[in-house]
Amino acid sequence: MKSLLFTLAVFMLLAQLVSGNWYVKKCLNDVGICKKKCKPEEMHVKNGWAMCGKQRDCCVPADRRANYPAFCVQTKTTRTSTVTATTATTTLMMTTASMSLMAPTPVSPTG
């Protein structure tokens, strides 16, 4: 009887030390998987942090990407020697009125 209790105690302690996760969190109606980093052939979901949290991305496999084309985003990545940089494009729009406000005003040297 003592060996049975000892065995149960050892199994209970080992169950707490297991580092693997038995539950895989799914996102986007169980199509994607929450991961720290998506594989190159997978697409990450725009605003996936709402489903997976801020530290993880919602990664959708390539074969299921056609089901949700509006949500999936492919980022352009450029690979350098040790760093991978993601490029994004933004547009800058200025009106002529705001340009005239920024024009320098003449200042007299005597004040």
Curated annotation (Swiss-Prot):
GO biological processes: defense response to Gram-negative bacterium; single fertilization
Cystine pairings recorded for this chain: C27-C58, C34-C52, C38-C59
Record keywords: Antibiotic, Antimicrobial, Cleavage on pair of basic residues, Defensin, Disulfide bond, Fertilization, Secreted, Signal
InterPro entries xref list: Beta-defensin
Post-translational modification: O-glycosylated; glycans contain alpha(2,3)-linked sialic acids.
GO cellular component terms, A-Z: extracellular region
Subcellular location: Secreted
Job description of the protein: Highly glycosylated atypical beta-defensin involved in several aspects of sperm function. Facilitates sperm transport in the female reproductive tract and contributes to sperm protection against immunodetection; both functions are probably implicating the negative surface charge provided by its O-linked oligosaccharides in the sperm glycocalyx. Involved in binding of sperm to oviductal epithelial cells to form a sperm reservoir until ovulation.
Subunit architecture: Homodimer or homooligomer; disulfide-linked.
Similarity section: Belongs to the beta-defensin family.
Entry protein name: Beta-defensin 126
Organism field: Gorilla gorilla gorilla
Gene from which the chain derives: DEFB126
